[in-house]
């Protein structure tokens, strides 16, 4: 069930083309828009540069604007 919330968050950011900051476990901050994602990776795009980031290396993803996520659709009861 946690994957559904993660998937909803990432998909909303991708569809709305919201710029995000991605913080890695080593302290590095990456910025860009989510182009695509799967179970293990996120493809970030910033201009012409693409970066494939493994999810296990990520600590935090911060959208640069508020995302409206449908919690019931994400499988999180009582949050809608």
Swiss-Prot record:
Homohexamer. The keyword Acetylation does not apply. The gene is hfq. The keyword DNA-binding does not apply. One of its GO terms (biological process) is regulation of DNA-templated transcription. Keywords: RNA-binding, Stress response. GO terms for cellular component: cytosol. Residues 7-67 form the Sm domain. This is RNA-binding protein Hfq. One of its GO terms (molecular function) is RNA binding. It holds the Pfam family Hfq. RNA chaperone that binds small regulatory RNA (sRNAs) and mRNAs to facilitate mRNA translational regulation in response to envelope stress, environmental stress and changes in metabolite concentrations. Also binds with high specificity to tRNAs. PROSITE patterns: SM (PS52002). It comes from the Bacteria. Belongs to the Hfq family.
